[in-house]
UniProtKB/Swiss-Prot annotation:
This is Putative pyruvate, phosphate dikinase regulatory protein. It catalyses: N(tele)-phospho-L-histidyl/L-threonyl-[pyruvate, phosphate dikinase] + ADP = N(tele)-phospho-L-histidyl/O-phospho-L-threonyl-[pyruvate, phosphate dikinase] + AMP + H(+); N(tele)-phospho-L-histidyl/O-phospho-L-threonyl-[pyruvate, phosphate dikinase] + phosphate + H(+) = N(tele)-phospho-L-histidyl/L-threonyl-[pyruvate, phosphate dikinase] + diphosphate. Belongs to the pyruvate, phosphate/water dikinase regulatory protein family. PDRP subfamily. Pfam families: Kinase-PPPase.
């Protein structure tokens, strides 16, 4: 059976559109409908990519894009590709504007003004998810904080913890075989933090990780020579960037976060 899929596209967090889509999808208990959110869309290239995915997966696109140019582009692109695209917010904005003789601001994310603190936290959490593990280097220059380190140095849990403090965090893994994204070298040193760890501690953590996955704990991932190679490369990268380095060997995530936040306040 083909999957039933709806892409939820938004120039903000996408919570509004997702709630509407899930409310509609809840009427079809016998045939579950999967919802995939695509938040913080800022360019037409991303819209075109979503349309291509929707066409390939025979999916529907539901969207909240407040900028008319972006709405019109998505609707035109979807029509050209034979994809169903449903505008959740646009028609209502236009009706309100016409009936009440008001001019819309056409600015994404205005609903967050209703509860700025709460929504800042949600936005930061979503940011941390979107820009986790170096998956999109565009987030590096948009972040309040950038974390770098080799695998298993708590980059992801630390990013999430800081996100709950309403800080937008991107994290980037440092791997000898992969050139760091050029954006890393354009970040101000005051917002980039390298997470350092002792070889012995990292070896122990990685072996436990492999065991938990049911894998051989003697794999190259948990080899001491490999670990030393990764840490040496990490040292080269942080030296080139000139960022602060925090030793996380025996630190809890909360302790590391506290150090980072104190440094940010300087």
């Amino acid at each position: 059976m083909n999957q039933r899929l709806v892409y939820v596209v938004s120039d903000s967090g996408g919570e509004t559109a997702e709630l509407v889509v899930k409310a509609a999808a809840s009427q079809f208990h016998a045939s579950p409908i999967q919802v995939k959110r695509v938040p913080y869309v800022e360019d037409k290239t991303t819209l075109a990519e979503v349309v291509a995915l929707a066409k390939m997966n025979r999916a529907i696109i539901a969207f909240t894009l407040v900028v008319p140019e972006m709405r019109e582009f998505l609707l035109a692109e979807a029509a050209r590709e034979g994809v169903v695209a449903y505008d959740i917010i646009g028609p209502l904005i236009e009706k309100m504007s016409h009936l009440f003789q008001l001019t819309p601001r056409y600015e994404p994310g205005q609903v967050r003004v209703l509860d700025e603190d709460y929504f800042k936290k949600i936005e930061a959490i979503e940011f941390a998810v979107k820009y986790d593990d170096g998956r999109d280097p565009r987030g590096i220059l948009r972040a309040d904080i950038v974390l770098i380190g080799v695998s298993r140095t708590s980059k992801t849990p630390l990013s999430q913890y800081l996100a709950h403090k309403r800080l937008k965090v991107a994290n980037v893994p440092i791997v000898p075989e992969v050139e760091p994204p050029e954006q890393l070298f354009r970040v101000g040193p005051g917002k980039c933090f390298g997470l350092k760890i002792s070889p012995d501690k990292l070896l122990s953590i990685r072996r436990e990780r492999l065991k938990s996955l049911g894998l051989n704990d003697q794999a190259i991932y948990a080899n001491m020579d490999r670990i030393k190679e990764e840490l040496a490369y990490f040292d080269e990268v942080v030296k080139k960037i000139g960022c602060d380095v925090i030793d996380v060997t025996n630190k809890a995530v909360e302790e590391t976060a506290s150090i980072i936040m104190k440094k940010l306040k300087r």
